[in-house]
Regions:
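Glycine-rich, highly charged phosphate/nucleotide-binding loops
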Residues: 51-71
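ADP-ribose/adenylate-binding Rossmann-like module
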Residues: 75-80, 86-113
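E1/E1-like adenylate-forming module used to activate ubiquitin-like modifiers
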Residues: 102-152
Length: 198
């Protein structure tokens, strides 16, 4: 199976999580970090889901899944403890051409959750195509050690420098040369030296 790696803009897009237990809550939390409009469907929910609903950060429908829950959804995650319920969610999504991820069931996934290293605006995603989530987690741990928190600050700095370069009247070649320079290992070393307290 060949997968297409992609980062999605989910801001204000309806994303439905079916199930309201710990796994579903973790999926909902990730969607909220992406500013999605999150709807959680499940008769019982974790305290976190209930708290987020009370604070207006997500919508919780305290009942079983119904096919019309996916109306106008951009994507759906099925994270119930019932394989029959997850299958019903998957079939409804397929019928309405809505992207679906059934947790721990690669055959019923239009997309997979990668293991992600987050350092501010820097995101490094690792996927094994559903073959070995444990390996993806191990690689994430290794990358977390390699790319410390300072990388987030450096990426923000590089982004600001890029804006300044784009405002200048430069040829494409000059612009590319400067971009390569500010994103080089030497640039990182200089950035780290400059940010150290005297």
């Amino acid at each position: 199976m060949s997968l297409f790696p992609i980062f999605l803009k989910l801001t204000k897009k309806k994303c439905v999580v079916v199930g309201a237990g710990k796994i579903a809550a973790a999926k909902a939390a990730g969607l909220l970090r992406s500013d999605a409009h999150v709807v959680v469907v499940g008769p019982e929910a974790t305290e976190w889901v209930q708290d987020q609903a009370r604070e207006g950060k997500l919508i919780w429908q305290p009942r079983e899944f119904a096919a019309d829950d996916i109306a106008q959804a951009f994507l759906v995650i099925a994270a119930t403890s019932s394989s029959a319920a997850n299958e019903a969610v998957f079939r409804a999504c397929a019928a309405h051409r809505v992207l679906c991820n059934v947790v721990d069931d690669p055959e019923r996934c239009d997309f997979f959750y990668p293991a992600v290293v987050r350092r501010g605006p820097l995101q490094i995603a690792i996927s094994t195509g559903g073959q070995s989530p444990a390996l993806a987690r191990r690689l994430r741990t290794e990358l977390e050690q390699q790319f410390g928190p300072e990388y987030g600050e450096w990426v923000e700095y590089v982004g600001e420098m890029r804006k300044q370069i784009l405002r200048q009247r430069l040829t494409t070649q000059e612009r590319r040369r400067l971009m390569d320079k500010i994103s080089s290992p030497k640039s990182l070393e200089q950035f780290l030296r400059d940010r150290r307290p005297a």
